[in-house]
Amino acid sequence: MRVLVIFIPKSFPNKCLHFKKLGLWIIFQASIKEKSNHQKEILTEQQQQQIINNHINNSISSENLVIPLNNYEESPTQSNISSCYSSQSNLSSYSSTGSLSSYYGSNYYHGASSSSISSINSNIANSNSSSTGRDSTPTPTPTPIQTPSSTPSKKKRSWRIRTPSPKPKLESNNNHHHNHHNYYNNFSEISIELPPTPTYPQKPSFLSNSNQIPRPKSRHSHTNSADSYTSSYSSTYPSSTRSSQKQPPYYQQPINNKNNNNNNNINNFNFNGNNNNNNNNNNNNNNNNNNNNNNNNNNNNNNSNNMKISTSPNKLSNSNHSTNSNFSQCSSSHSLLDTNIGGINVNTQNLVSFTNETSNSGSTIIKPVALKSSSRSVFNSSNNQQYLFSSSTLSSSSSTKTNNNSTTTTTTTTAKTSSTSTNDYSSIKGKSLIDDDASCSISSFNAIEQQVLIPTVLSSSSSSHVMKRSNGSSNGGNSTIQSPSCNQISINKNNLVDIDDEDEDDEDDINGHWEKITIPSNMCRDQISIKNNFDESTKVIC
């Protein structure tokens, strides 16, 4: 520790004032008057010896010791040092310019040889107990002089708390390098037991893509569209086997017509749970038609026949409105709408494929009816009827299931007569769009706008045949054309859309604003073309 001793003249009342400031003890001490030089030297030696002893006890180097420069002679009338702190009024501090001398050293106190702070405190207690009052003029006490310390003391260094080394103690060994490696080897010897790695069974190869069923190899497997995969699946597995298996999902992707030649099944119209088997086997086709008729009677309330026209070609989308028509003995029908003025649109949207069937009585031809609509009305007459199919490229049969579930009827007529197209229907509301003589009827209800069906074409061929619209005669081919029966053509009035709603002029309706063409659920395998005589345009639809 450091002590600053200030010698004050004997006229000062506070003879033993001391305090600690910033870790430095400051002591005010009365001066001692030396009578002779010899006595002065003796006092000086005594002070030096006392300082050295204090230095040894407090572990302070002798370089920090400063010997007092001025030692006043002790007067005979020197007051006793025990007169410190005689009164509280004398403890006020004043500034003075008296003779002061700075002193650096350890615990130094006049008349005491103690080397600790406790000795100073004991002296203060003794001085307070034996203090005597002394009248003297109050003089200001001098301001203590503090000198900055440049070097820290060793005692402060000993106060620092040192954390123990994290390195564990090792057994004494002469080879220090060996001990260094032994320390790190101790950690490597720790064994950590991990749980066993779980083993899972190997995933089968056919379940690599869980969203698809294993794709069978067929002649249509080279196509890139998703609908061709659906058709190849249905054509590979028979209907009896396919009913117990998982059906492929419904795809809504465009169809590449050129890569789907002779694919005679519309799998996107799988509303009844069973599709027509397309193996060109007449017996299987007739059985599947009967199954479709049975399923229509049971599932017509649960299945939807409404589909919207999408902007992309040949893309089907389910409608939010379900068909509520009562199909007694009719198969499911699918509508075809014209979105362009002057004829049926040929932007690969209105292409239809049908099933090739022959009956016992001979080959027949299916003729769908082309309907015109304006202000929610249907106009159809013999002068404006249009035959969409060629007898030379298409043959099919219509099987109508009767009540006894055993007979199959076939109706054949000429091209100039038709049992379903000669009736003039003026309005949709309250009327049945099928002839009264037909074997079934559709319940009437109001038409809903913007609900349109468009079928997807899965087959086409290189042959094309242009049909004319003159009294129902075809451009090439003299064979008879069958008037479609009830199970072949049915009209879904919920899907009729009035394109020309604001125009009430009948003259504009003659321009051939074909709104809807209904087609049967059976499919053909040949290409179909139609011609609209209003604007002399020929468009291929199959």
From Swiss-Prot:
Residues 125-182, 194-333, 390-428, 459-487 are annotated as: Disordered. Residues 125-138, 228-306, 314-333, 390-423, 459-479 have a biased composition (Low complexity). Residues 202-213 have a biased composition (Polar residues). This is Uncharacterized protein DDB_G0275275. It comes from the Eukaryota.
